[in-house]
């Protein structure tokens, strides 16, 4: 003695479950087809911005070329000399990096990181 409404309820639920993915796919297609706002950036602004960046890069490259160290001044595998009382090392966590060599009679203090 089931009522006709109880028989229709499972059928309506199954139909709804079958239609939900189709509705979601349609909504997703509409979202994908919407054009993006690319007209915010005009071609003129991009060209002028690129020119500015290129000019700045060329200036930096010119400065780097002028600061080259002559080959006879390069000392591979050596660090420069520093004065007494000057910072001779850098601490990064548990590691200590050497910045320069201390002069004779002094050594790099591992606590103060200075030539003492």
Curated annotation (Swiss-Prot):
Q: What is its main location?
A: secreted
Domain of life, source organism = Eukaryota
Q: Name one GO molecular function term.
A: neuropeptide hormone activity
- Modified residue annotations for Phosphotyrosine: 41
- Alphabetized CDD domains for the sequence: CART_CTD-like
- Give the GO terms filed under biological process for this record: adult feeding behavior; cellular response to starvation; chemical synaptic transmission; circadian regulation of gene expression; G protein-coupled receptor signaling pathway; intracellular glucose homeostasis; negative regulation of appetite; negative regulation of bone resorption
Q: Which SUPFAM superfamilies match?
A: Satiety factor CART (cocaine and amphetamine regulated transcript)
Q: Which residues carry this modification: Phosphoserine?
A: 48
- Which pairs are disulfide-linked? 82-100, 88-108, 102-115
| Keyword vocabulary terms for this entry | Cleavage on pair of basic residues, Disulfide bond, Neuropeptide, Neurotransmitter, Obesity, Phosphoprotein, Secreted, Signal
User: Which cell locations does it reside in?
Assistant: Secreted
**Which InterPro entries does this entry report, sorted A to Z?**
CART, CART_C_sf
Family, according to the entry, reads as follows:
Belongs to the CART family.
UniProt protein name: Cocaine- and amphetamine-regulated transcript protein
Organism of origin is Bos taurus (Bovine)
The lineage is: Eukaryota, Metazoa, Chordata, Craniata, Vertebrata
């Amino acid at each position: 003695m089931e009522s006709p409404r109880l028989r229709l309820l499972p059928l309506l639920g199954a139909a709804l479950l079958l239609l939900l993915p189709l509705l979601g796919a349609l909504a997703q297609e509409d979202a994908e087809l919407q054009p993006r706002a690319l007209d915010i950036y005009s071609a003129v602004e991009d060209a002028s911005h690129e020119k500015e960046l290129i000019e700045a890069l060329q200036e930096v490259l010119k400065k780097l070329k002028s600061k080259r160290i002559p080959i006879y001044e390069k000392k591979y595998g050596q660090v420069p000399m520093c004065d007494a009382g000057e910072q001779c090392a850098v601490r990064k966590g548990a590691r200590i990096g050497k910045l320069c060599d201390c002069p004779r009679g002094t050594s790099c203090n591992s606590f103060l990181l200075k030539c003492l």
